[in-house]
Amino acid sequence: MGLDNYIQTAMRSILKNPILEVLSEIKITKILKQSNFVKREVGYPPFQIILHFVYMLVMNKRQSTFIKNSENAFGKDAYYRFIKESRYNWRKFLILSSAAILQRIKPLHKNGEHRLLIIDDTVEPKRGKFIEGSCKYVWSNKEHKSINALNIVSLNYADSHSTFQVDFSIKMNDSKRKEISEFTSKLHHRSNSYQRKSEIIKSKNTLAIEMLERALNNGVEADYLLVDSWYAKPNFIEKANELGMPVISRLPNNKLIWNFKGKHKTMNAIYESLKNSRHKSGGQHGKISYKYFDAIIEHAVLGKIKLVFLHTGKDLLVFISTDITIAGKEIIATYKKRWNIEQGYKDLRNLFGLGKEENRIYEALIAKITLSMFTYNIVSYINRIKHEPQTLGELFRDLECELETLAISMQLFIQILTKISEIQNVVKDNKDLLQIIAVISAFTQKELGFMCES
């Protein structure tokens, strides 16, 4: 074994980069090629640029700060050109990487644990007048008013331990700030960016079904699809069932949308006809006590479905399951997991830069949102396979500290060796020292992906 191999073997056992380890496990190079991330005649390898963006997010560094403090950073124009490139398939990159991660955690599932796909949307405030895809009047549940914002419809995966981001679309309504024809980039109609831009005017339900179909076609597996009352329409649920995905949802109490067979056609009428004859069970959610019962009902479009009527004393909530074998108690417990996504959005905003994109060009917004979700998935996976799982916030801070400390320490070590090599007597006595320094420096950069100034 040569000197180079001896040094690399010794360092590999000590110098561990959790980010690169995950990327290697999911075969990120293959995923990049499948998603059309190939190096052009001029420029840097896409893998290296994506790795730098991941480090910026994990280490909580602005792009300008990362460029200033990292010896191996590229110029700012390289990063800007990269996120505006129309040929890259960002959607395929996110779906394939999340599917690969989900395959890695598949052996960790226990019998009886449900794997869930969850469709939800989030509103990210955007004040700028020229941000492509943003709208003037988007209702924010957080601020309880209409605001200037991006409306992001997302498909998420959740189980009893983790959540992952699988896909997303930007939805533009009639209050759009810019028409699609006014977007900055003039794109070829066959480019990936053009195809993605064209979907922006589709309905939420259409976007959701398309995301679900893509995920299933790319190997994402789940037991149930969870949606809120916005998506809970008979035609939507029927299409999800046709894709082989049972649906659990809260229903809107709307007699125009939901009309049942038989004597009692509305949800209120069905509830009134059954409430005195059915055994009621009790439960507690926080400080709220409730009673519920379930019933199998016939629907004109969906056939036999199970409804769960939950009464808190003030409000009547109705849940649907197209799987009629599942118990009412389990339907309620499963639907509660939909709210885990709210914590996921919070982590994305606070830790992974979602909503903080400083771009107005549509292609760049898609790229930065994808990178935020991709980095979230990596950190969530690292947390899942640890023997002592933490909150994502705790793990995020640990990784931030670990990566930066490791990079600075190795840089200092190399500087010390370099100073030693400059002593004439040492060089005479040990001709291999300069080679050792070169090998350590190159291997450290390869394993970390960057070097920090001390």
Role assignments for model-derived ranges:
Residues H52, F66-N69, E113-R127, L155, ...:
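Short, conserved catalytic/metal-binding motifs centered on acidic residues
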Residues R127-F130, K233-A240, L256-G262:
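A short acidic (Asp/Glu
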Residues L20, L117-V123, Y271, H279, ...:
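Short amphipathic alpha-helical "interface-anchor" segments enriched in bulky aromatics
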Residues M59, D77-R81, K142-V220, K304-V318:
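Electropositive, glycine- and tryptophan-enriched low-complexity nucleic-acid-binding patches
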Residues E85-S175, S289-F293:
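Active-site-proximal, Lys/Arg-enriched surface segment
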Residues M1-Y44, M172-H188, Y194-K204, I209-E213, ...:
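A short, flexible helix-boundary coil/loop motif
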Residues M245-L256:
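Acidic, His- and aromatic-enriched active-site or binding-groove loops in soluble protein domains
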Residues K33-Q103, G112, S154, A158-F164, ...:
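Short, positively charged, Gly/Tyr-enriched micro-motifs
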